[in-house]
Amino acid sequence: MEQGIITPEANTIAWDGAAYPFESWNRDQTLRSAMQASVNWYLNALDQSAGSAQTEDFFSKIGYGDCNFGNDSDGFWNGSGVKISALEQVELLVKLYRNDFGFRDESIAAVRDAILLDEDGLYGKTGTGRLNDTNIAGWFIGFVETHQGTYFVAVYLHSQNGSDGALAYETASNILKDMNIIE
């Protein structure tokens, strides 16, 4: 959004007609639908429109992990060497929440809208790591605003027997419920 590739009002990217591994990916996508379903082709299209140098500069600017993007033409989130810890993700999310990066307010509002997950006011993003067509890792990073303050959470799960972003989200929700932060 900061580069004008999409805007808060105009962020639909047309589906290219390719058969993707998840039915929810096989349609036109908005920022919200792409974030909700982790639609890699949408995010890759944004990266390609920006160009690899600009994308890498952006992630370096915000300090996204070790910024080891490799040469993956399918997008750095599809198996590159980028490494970021749960703590680093929370620190990055806090900076984004406070808008320490100086992004336009409407860009921040559009991203917040795209990652709103439930009626408890929990915002976040899930991710699933796959190896040989098996889900082996799940993560969730998010925040919730309450009368007592804003709480940030990150959960990373790894299991050869199966783990995914939905399980990490459920785990994070249960932690927040156990701490009486959400109902």
What is the role of each PLM region?
Residues 11-24, 33:
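Acidic helix-start/capping segments at beta-turn-to-alpha-helix junctions
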Residues 33-35, 42-45, 66-68, 142, ...:
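Structural recognition of the beta-strand scaffold that forms the well-ordered cores
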Residues 8-14, 46-47, 67-73, 100-108:
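Surface-exposed patches in mature extracellular/periplasmic domains of secreted proteins
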Residues 23-27, 31, 43-94:
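Mid-domain, small-residue-enriched loop/turn segments at the edges of structured enzyme/sensor domains
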Residues 48-51, 94-183:
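Structured C-terminal helix/loop/strand segments within mature extracytoplasmic catalytic/sensor domains
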Residues 1-13, 34, 153:
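Active-site SXXK
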Residues 10, 85-88, 137-139, 149:
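Envelope-exposed proteins and targeting segments
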Residues 19-20, 40-42, 65-66, 73-83, ...:
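Solvent-exposed loop/turn segments at secondary-structure junctions
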